[in-house]
């Protein structure tokens, strides 16, 4: 499952980070509005799926049975986020996309993240799981870098560069899983 997460991360963020890097190194963000908007749209969906996969990793790792409410919450929030991402009011390809829709679509995403942070924190602690002891922190860091971008990137464009350490936090997430899997197979 961490392989799926790596592909989701790489493909989703490539659509967002590559145009941003090219824009900042060439003619500026204003000349890459469509590419940046499309990249944000794609990465919004892929990262939602990333969290659903991460939830299933938690269930598998800790042999979770039941927890129907948590499963329903994760899937409902993911579905709501994807529906909100598809709404034309997002104006993804426009230079003046409304901040309000950036906030609306990120509320279910943040709630998904919060649920998964709590689940991994509690489970790693209860199971004395040294391999996954920092999984919760990778998610906290990813949101700590992501939230300022959502709220301030239109006013302070360079803040969009926080997407790079956000991606590094996600890479750390995948590495934690890969190293644990490699260790358990050996």
Regions of interest found by a model, annotated:
Residues 28-40, 94-107, 156-168:
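Non-cytosolic membrane-interface motifs at loop->transmembrane helix junctions
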Residues 71-74, 95-113, 129-136, 163:
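A loop-to-helix transmembrane entry motif
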Residues 4-22, 79-81, 137-150:
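Hydrophobic alpha-helical transmembrane segments of multi-pass membrane proteins
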Residues 15-32, 37-71, 83-85, 120, ...:
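Internal transmembrane alpha-helix with an interfacial aromatic "cap," most often the third helix
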Residues 76-103, 120-124:
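Membrane-helix boundary elements
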Residues 52-58, 83-88, 107-133, 145-152, ...:
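Alpha-helical transmembrane segments in multipass membrane proteins, preferentially the mid-helix core
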